[in-house]
Every structure is written in structure tokens, then in C-alpha cells.
């Protein structure tokens, strides 16, 4: 290799297609002595030492965090053993002064002007004190929330300046991912609206950093990028991201839920192996000691958090939902594996109804499960469990049963005879009887109807063309109105729901549990999409609302109805301010004045690609049209270049 130029002091390795591997600031010169500036002495996170584990201060290169707010570092100076910092609130622009007195043991005495001086530690101490807190009272309460924080070690050269929060309305299956804007100094913030407390995550690349927040709250997070990279280097999904800190009203619950997840891990490898080697009953036995261990851990943690009834409630729900989700997930993919390995005896064994007995111990009537990160998975598995297939099985008849049968005014056998078809004695006898009953409705024994069809089967098979002609000439089926079609659809759904209600009643002691009500709200988008008449749709929603015991479910049902059957169809949508809107407007700016068909898609999304193929003829029709344009938007992450070109 050629020697580097003598003036080169620093080198970087930056890969625009793989920012995770970026390396920068490799120094080729001898480093100066350790930074001994006043800021270097106090730059870190400072935690209370009273047993609460509370993060009170964060001091960094250009910003500081305290009072659940972000401040700009204005000035720092040393006065004897003390270090004084002047800070300016980033929002209100108000200034304040902090005083730091480092101690020999590594702790630090910190004082806000006019407040008591207290001792703080660089390390978060084990929790020994938990503030008393009542259980959830008003769980549903729509309000905005504000998430902010700092990524220590962030540099724009890492190749990203945004993060994501994958938010969802679990009541309606609506997803609304929210962008987190990251400033060059590593601070970040975003605001979003939620309907109830949630456990979610800040997503940076493939790394998910959890948090818990409630409507109306502000939560501040500290993320250590080196800890994120340690997990990435470990190539282990279960490797903990350390040093994360939280500040705000729900900080203690954020710590709790993050740490508790690491105590009740269940690796996918065990699930995958069990699906291929165990029968359903064997898997339930396999899971018993694992779930028992989770519950023991939950009991121990609950003892520490006992003063907070809300914390204890969240702990119990987390164990229950994880256990339930695993028992549901075991049943998935077994049919697929069975097709791959037709000799596997374990895969030939299907679950019986008793497998679902675990549901009686699940919090199906507890709306607070929606705060849990596993809520979406559990509800999805619950509402589509295989046991509900019974509701869709065709009604079977006994040969001795009788049904109402309407005879056509022109019997088929008479039509065939007039066309020159020869009938045998049995067929002629049937024809004469049908002539007498033509146009009437009468009771007929199933056994008799089956016997008659068997006697005419060979004739029907031979005279297919004449039968088609008969159907075209004499079919008396009248054209149904849209209202009739909608009513038939609703009646069919109500029949299935009634059967499912009966199945739920056998599995769970409380009738009409809340999660089953939520499942019915979640199905509204699809059902209302199949009901075209607005009046019928409103009547349908009114009938559904009668079963809801939680008022917020009724209001969400009304909102879905307004979306599918709006009173005012001439509506526009104002795009929210932010980087995403700027990018979108930049994409469409060259098509001003046109009607735009915009499709967001990914190479990994089967329905997306099917939708593109389904509109191929439409694109041909409007190709080069002066007033119409198709725009398809994807990303490098969702559609890698190699797959995109295919």
C-alpha cells in the first residue's frame, strides 16, 4: 500500500449502504492527555442515592437534562472545589445555575439554585424504595405525549438522523409509525397521541429500546450508543441494551418493564424445535415449569414493587400474555411443517378443545392488557384461534330430518321430457309427483330428497347442456337489492358471532369478556367495508354497541363507521408538519394539478405487490394522461436493490 500523506491525521471508513459498520475518527497522532476540563469531571448521568434509582441529571457536551427537560449548556467554570454551570431551557429560554462538588468516592454533591444540596451517584443503585401508586382508574384517555432524550455517542456520520416508534391502535388495527428526529448533538424528540398507557420502543435500525408512557406525559430517555453497538456485535436478539435511563412520571415503570423482560425470556429456538417434535399436549406440559418459573420471578419482583398497585398489575399481565402468546404460537406453522415432513408423527396430532383451557387463566376481561407490548400478538392469536373454525362449519342434517323445499313451477324432468329425453320408470314417477307439487313449498324428508337425487344423478350428468338451458330459462331468482345483500351479510356474521360467543362461554367464566368485545371492534373495518348501504351500516354498528361494557369501545366503533361511511364525503386531509411530509411533497412537486394515485409498498409485502399487479390495466389506461399520475414509493430498507430489480 502507498503510505498515507504526511498531513493525514485522522481517517474514516464510511459505508453509505451499511451505516452500522461505519468507523470514524481513527487518529494517527498521539492523543493528548486525558481531558481535565471542568465539564469532563461531571459529564455523565447522576442518579439519586436514596434507593429510588431515579435519574436526576444528565450532563453532556452541549446539552444537559434535568427536571424532565432539555437545556443548552451556556457556561461552565470552576470555583474552588465547585463547578458551576449556567443552563438555558431549550423551550422557555429561562436560565438556571447548577453547582457540582465532586467527591473522592466518585459521587457528586449537586445543587440547583435555591434547593437543597444532595449526593448523587454515577451508577444507578438497586431499587429499595418504590413510591405508592394506585391501580389504573381511567384507563382510556386520549391525549398527546412527548418523548425526548439524548443518544450518547451519536454522530451524524453514523448514517441516520431519524428513529421510529411503531404506534398502533389495537382496538381498530390501525398503525401509525411515528418519526423521531435526531439532532446533530444527539438529542431527539417527537410528539404523538395515544388513547391509553402503552409500552413501546424507540427503534434505531434493528435495535428496539423500550419505554412506557401514559397520555399527557413527557418522558425523557438516555440511550448509550456504545451499549446499542455491543448488542449489535453480539448478534443476539436477547442481549440486553444496558445503561438506558428514564426520567418523568412513568420512569420507574419504564425501568421495571425493560428489566422484567430480561428475566422472563423465551427463545424462539425452543418454540421452533417444540413445534416440530412435540404434540400439543406435550408442549403444554413442556411449558408448565417455564411458566411456573416466570410466575415465581413475577412474585419476587412484585414484592419489591408492592406499594405500586399499577406496577404489580403490569407485571402479572406481562407474564400472562407472554404465556398465552407462546401457547397460541405453538399451533402456528405446524400444518406447514407437516407438509414438509409427512412422516413426523408429532405433527399429525391436532390439538383438541382441552388445549385451550389455558384461556380461563388469561386476563380476557382486563382492558389494561392493552398497555402491554404483547397485546397485539395475543389479541390477534385469540381472535383467529383455530377453535373458532367450528363456527364456520356447514350445518349438517340427519337423514331423518325434514326441511322446507320449494318445488319449481316448471319441473326440470318435465323440461327434459319435452326436449325428447327418455325417462325411466323411477324418473317418470318423480316427475309426476313434482308436477303435482309445482310452485308449492312442502316438507320433505332428507332421506327422500337424497334418494331422488341418486336416481337422477346419471341423467343430470348426461344432459348438462339442457340443464344449463333450463336454468337460464326458468331461474326464478330475483335480483337482490343492496339492502337485502347487506342484511344477508349481517345475518351471516351474527350467526357466526353467536357460535363464537358460545365457544367463548365454554372457555371463560365471565360472559362477553372485554378482549372479545375488542375483537369485534377490530373486525368492524372489514365488516363495514362489505356493507354498502349507509343506513344498514349505522344500524349494524348500533346493534354491536349494545354489547360493549366500555364506553370508549363504542366511540371507536363510531369513528370506524365515520371512516367507512362518512356523512361528508368531500373531505381533505392536511399532512402533518415534519420531515416525512417534506420528503413526500418533494416527490409529488413535479405533478402539480394532477390527480395522483400514491402507493407505498415493499418487495417483502405480498399484498403490496399483488395490489400493484391488480392495477396494471389501470396504469395502461391512464399512461401519459395529462391529468393523472401513478406514484409508487418504497425505501432501500424495505426493498433492497437486488430484490427491487427482480
Feature locations, PLM:
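Conserved redox-active cysteine motifs that mediate thiol-disulfide chemistry
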Residues: 592, 600-620, 635, 639
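Signature tryptophan residues that serve as conserved aromatic anchors
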Residues: 1, 46, 55, 601-604, ...
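Oxidative protein folding and maturation machinery
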Residues: 234-593
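Extended hydrophobic secondary-structure segments
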Residues: 25, 583-587, 596-609
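A non-transmembrane, solvent-exposed segment enriched in polar/low-complexity residues
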Residues: 4, 18-19, 28, 33-38, ...
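Tryptophan-anchored aromatic micro-motifs
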Residues: 1, 12, 16-56
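Thiol-based oxidoreductase modules, predominantly thioredoxin-like and allied folds used
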Residues: 625-642, 646
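Loop/turn elements at helix/coil->beta-strand transitions in domains of secreted/extracellular proteins
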Residues: 592-596, 626-629
Amino acid at each position: 500500500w502507498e503510505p498515507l500523506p504526511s498531513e493525514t491525521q485522522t481517517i474514516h471508513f464510511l459505508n453509505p449502504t451499511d451505516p452500522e459498520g461505519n468507523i470514524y475518527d481513527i487518529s494517527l497522532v498521539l492523543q493528548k492527555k486525558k481531558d481535565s476540563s471542568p465539564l469532563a469531571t461531571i459529564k455523565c448521568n447522576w442518579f439519586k442515592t436514596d434507593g429510588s434509582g431515579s435519574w436526576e441529571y444528565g450532563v453532556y457536551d452541549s446539552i444537559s437534562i434535568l427536571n424532565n427537560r432539555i437545556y443548552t449548556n451556556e457556561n461552565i467554570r470552576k470555583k474552588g472545589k465547585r463547578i458551576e454551570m449556567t443552563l438555558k431551557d431549550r423551550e422557555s429560554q429561562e436560565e438556571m445555575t447548577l453547582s457540582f462538588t465532586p467527591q473522592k468516592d466518585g459521587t457528586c454533591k449537586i445543587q440547583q439554585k435555591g434547593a437543597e444540596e444532595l449526593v448523587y451517584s454515577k451508577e444507578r443503585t438497586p431499587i429499595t424504595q418504590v413510591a405508592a401508586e394506585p391501580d389504573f382508574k381511567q384507563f382510556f384517555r386520549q391525549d398527546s405525549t412527548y418523548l425526548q432524550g439524548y443518544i450518547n455517542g451519536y454522530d451524524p456520520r453514523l448514517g441516520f438522523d431519524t428513529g421510529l416508534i411503531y404506534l398502533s391502535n389495537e382496538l381498530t388495527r390501525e398503525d401509525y409509525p411515528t418519526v423521531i428526529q435526531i439532532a446533530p448533538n444527539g438529542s431527539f424528540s417527537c410528539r404523538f397521541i395515544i388513547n391509553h398507557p402503552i409500552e413501546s420502543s424507540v427503534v434505531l435500525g434493528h435495535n428496539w429500546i423500550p419505554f412506557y408512557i401514559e397520555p399527557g406525559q413527557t418522558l425523557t430517555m438516555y440511550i448509550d450508543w456504545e451499549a446499542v453497538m455491543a448488542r449489535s456485535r453480539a448478534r443476539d436478539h436477547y442481549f440486553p441494551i444496558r445503561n438506558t435511563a428514564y426520567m418523568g412520571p412513568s420512569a420507574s415503570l419504564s425501568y421495571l418493564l425493560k428489566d422484567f423482560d430480561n428475566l422472563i425470556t423465551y427463545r424462539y429456538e425452543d418454540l421452533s424445535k417444540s413445534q416440530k417434535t412435540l404434540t400439543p399436549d406435550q408442549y403444554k406440559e413442556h411449558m408448565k415449569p417455564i411458566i411456573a418459573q416466570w410466575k415465581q420471578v413475577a412474585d419476587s419482583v412484585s414484592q419489591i414493587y408492592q406499594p405500586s398497585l399499577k406496577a404489580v398489575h403490569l407485571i402479572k399481565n406481562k407474564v400472562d400474555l407472554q404465556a398465552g402468546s407462546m401457547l397460541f404460537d405453538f399451533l402456528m406453522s405446524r400444518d406447514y411443517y407437516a407438509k414438509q415432513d409427512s412422516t413426523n408423527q408429532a405433527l399429525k396430532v391436532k390439538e383438541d378443545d382441552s388445549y385451550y383451557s389455558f384461556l380461563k387463566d388469561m386476563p380476557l376481561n382486563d382492558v389494561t392488557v392493552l398497555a402491554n407490548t404483547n397485546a397485539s400478538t395475543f389479541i390477534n392469536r385469540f381472535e383467529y384461534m383455530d377453535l373458532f373454525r367450528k363456527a364456520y362449519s356447514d350445518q349438517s342434517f340427519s337423514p331423518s330430518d325434514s326441511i322446507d323445499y320449494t318445488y319449481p313451477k316448471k319441473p326440470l324432468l318435465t323440461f327434459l321430457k319435452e326436449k325428447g329425453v327418455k325417462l325411466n320408470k323411477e324418473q317418470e314417477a318423480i316427475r309426476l309427483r313434482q308436477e303435482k307439487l309445482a310452485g308449492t313449498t312442502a316438507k320433505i324428508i332428507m332421506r327422500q330428497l337424497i334418494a331422488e337425487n341418486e336416481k337422477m344423478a346419471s341423467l343430470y350428468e348426461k344432459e348438462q347442456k339442457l340443464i344449463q338451458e333450463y336454468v337460464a330459462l326458468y331461474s326464478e331468482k330475483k335480483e337482490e337489492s343492496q339492502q337485502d345483500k347487506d342484511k344477508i351479510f349481517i345475518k351471516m356474521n351474527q350467526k357466526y358471532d353467536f357460535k363464537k360467543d358460545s365457544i367463548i362461554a365454554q372457555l371463560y367464566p365471565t360472559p362477553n369478556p372485554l378482549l372479545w368485545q375488542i375483537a369485534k371492534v377490530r373486525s368492524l373495518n372489514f365488516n363495514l367495508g362489505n356493507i354498502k348501504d349507509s343506513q344498514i351500516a349505522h344500524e349494524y354498528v348500533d346493534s354491536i354497541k349494545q354489547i360493549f361494557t366500555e364506553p370508549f369501545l363504542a366511540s371507536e366503533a363510531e369513528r370506524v363507521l365515520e371512516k367507512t361511511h362518512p356523512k361528508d364525503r368531500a373531505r381533505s386531509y392536511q399532512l402533518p408538519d415534519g420531515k416525512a411530509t417534506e420528503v413526500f411533497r418533494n416527490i409529488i412537486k413535479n405533478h402539480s394539478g394532477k390527480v395522483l394515485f400514491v402507493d407505498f409498498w415493499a418487495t417483502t409485502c405480498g399484498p403490496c405487490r399483488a395490489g400493484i399487479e391488480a392495477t396494471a390495466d389501470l396504469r395502461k389506461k391512464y399512461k401519459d394522461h395529462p391529468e393523472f399520475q401513478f406514484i409508487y414509493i418504497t425505501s432501500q430498507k424495505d426493498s433492497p436493490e437486488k430484490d427491487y430489480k427482480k
